[in-house]
Amino acid sequence: MQNLLPNGEWQMAAIMGLNDNEVEDICKKVKSGFVVPANYNSVGQVVISGEKEAIIEAEKIAKEMGAKKVRILKTAGPFHTEKLIESSKALRKELKNVTIHKFETKVIKNIDGEMYKDTDDVKDILARHIINPVNFTKVIQNMLNNGIDTFIEIGPRKNIIRICKKNTDK
């Protein structure tokens, strides 16, 4: 799907210390290009995604509004935004050849943090994941509300565990 990335210079940035509404307002204020929230990671941490110039402008506005930190992420695409509609369409097409079996365990959607009720809409939701923000805050809250209190991260870093800790009191 890398070959389906739109042309242009794209970036993502994590804004820390502002709430969701403040970050959404920042994105609306940006005049230099496309930028939108892409990941609602935790209370006080939202990742934005968009054109490089727009990210730079959003960073400036965020700092003026009192953001504790803005960190540019090492990415090269407008992930979790409508700019990846062609990738979403390509995935949707590929998923037509995939059989989704009944879940053996509960599965939570990144888009809204809700559990899948059945497998009927899995393919649609997977394709929508590419063009919609990740709502990790709601995912973690739903897991906690359903009695899940142990999180294991498999990977080279501990980014997800840090975000999980910010979403819990543990």
Show the residue positions of the predicted features.
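Alpha/beta catalytic cores of group-transfer enzymes, especially the acyltransferase/condensing modules
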Residues: 1-132, 162
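Flexible, low-complexity segments
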Residues: 128-170
